[in-house]
From Swiss-Prot:
Keywords: Isomerase, tRNA processing. The active site is at residue 80. One of its GO terms (biological process) is tRNA pseudouridine synthesis. It comes from Pectobacterium carotovorum subsp. carotovorum (strain PC1). Its EC number is 5.4.99.27. This is tRNA pseudouridine synthase D. CDD domains: PseudoU_synth_EcTruD. Responsible for synthesis of pseudouridine from uracil-13 in transfer RNAs. The keyword ATP-binding does not apply. The lineage of its organism: Bacteria, Pseudomonadati, Pseudomonadota, Gammaproteobacteria, Enterobacterales.
Length: 348
């Protein structure tokens, strides 16, 4: 399900409106690697603050500056162009001196830190991100304030944001054409975008179905449960439901939904039947990820922002700060606050 307007809300549909990203400075993201660089090694880590530049462009410019092939430059995650973001780039430079990045002239970018590390920085190898958002032109301060309290206590649906689906949902449209052999997709990046969009749409559809049935916080027989903050999961057995529900209520466990691929969903019994029914209509996308041998995975149904705080600048503008684990979308938090908000599209 790619249309966010069709997805169910956890706290009911918001009534307030407002704007996000009126300026790049209203959307600030600071990467949290979750570890300290070693200080030595064959990898050069460069922390960059950028505005108006996407991640791939900066990687290309760093490769050119350091006289390296693009494949020698990596990063932990893609960051929005329409924002102020701080992220690390990794340059593989064994036996080479560290370049003097103070001479790098790249509009919209500042090098904040340079160090060495022993291991390559790969996609997903970060703990999370710190966000500072400013919502402007808020129509109802009282409602947004009440929703901020609810979100801090009860979280939000862990939906993939519209960025995942491309401009006007183009990634999904192309994925369906590819699945039906109406187009050929040779570029590796595009294949990855289309497959990710397909799995994300199916995940969103299952999460929305659980919310619609008021089962986002109810353990079903056969549910795939995850220890909070961990990636591994286990299946809920019939004789353990009461104990597992208590652990879920205490915040020790989280219910997961599928990122379908070439393999079983992972759930059993009632939960499996629920997910299969929820995925009705997604046979084309499901067949694509199976055909392309994408590995099945699971992802938490709900997202709990950490270190959440907010301050009103005036009656129509509020600054909201929070931390999210890697792979989560800040716009999924905003979606529970505002009925509609201005946002920037991300395409392939």
């Amino acid at each position: 399900m790619e249309n966010s307007e069709q997805l169910v809300w956890l706290h009911g549909e918001p009534q307030a409106t407002g704007s996000l990203k009126s300026a790049a400075e209203d959307f600030v993201v600071v990467e949290d690697l979750g570890f300290q660089p070693d200080g030595d090694g064959e990898q050069v880590l460069v922390r960059v603050r950028k505005r108006g530049c996407n991640t791939q462009f900066v990687a290309e410019m760093l490769a050119k500056f350091a006289r390296l092939p693009l494949r020698a430059v990596s990063y932990a995650g893609l960051k929005d162009r329409h924002a102020v973001t701080e992220q690390w780039f990794c340059l593989h430079m064994p036996g080479k001196d560290t370049p003097d990045f103070s001479t790098l002239a790249l509009e919209g970018c500042d090098v904040l830190e340079v160090t060495r590390h022993r291991r390559k920085l790969r996609i997903g190898t970060l703990r999370g991100n710190h966000f500072t958002l400013v919502l402007r032109q808020v129509s109802d301060r009282r409602e947004v304030d009440a929703r901020l309290v609810l979100i801090a206590a009860n979280g939000v649906p862990n939906y993939f944001g519209s960025q995942r689906f491309g401009r006007n949902g183009n990634n999904l449209e192309q994925a369906r054409l590819w699945a039906n052999n109406e187009i050929r997709v040779k570029e590796r990046n595009k294949r990855s975008f289309y497959l990710s969009a397909s799995r994300s749409a199916m995940f969103n559809q299952v999460v929305s179905a659980r919310l619609a049935g008021e089962q986002a916080k109810t353990v079903l027989c056969g549910d795939a449960l995850q220890l909070t903050g961990r990636g591994s999961w286990f299946v809920a057995k019939p004789d353990e439901l009461e104990t597992l529900q208590a652990r879920l209520d205490a915040g020790e466990l989280q219910i997961t939904a599928p990122l379908p691929g070439d393999g079983e969903l992972g759930t059993q019994d009632d939960a499996r039947a629920f997910e299969e029914l929820a995925l009705t209509g997604q046979e084309t996308l499901w067949s694509l990820v199976k055909r392309e041998r994408v590995e099945s995975a699971r992802r938490a149904v709900l997202l709990y922002p950490q270190q959440m705080c907010w301050e009103w600048q005036d009656d129509t503008a509020v600054e909201v700060k929070f931390w999210l684990p890697a792979g989560s979308f800040a716009t999924s938090v905003v979606r529970e606050l505002l009925q509609s908000f201005q946002d920037a599209d991300i395409g392939v």
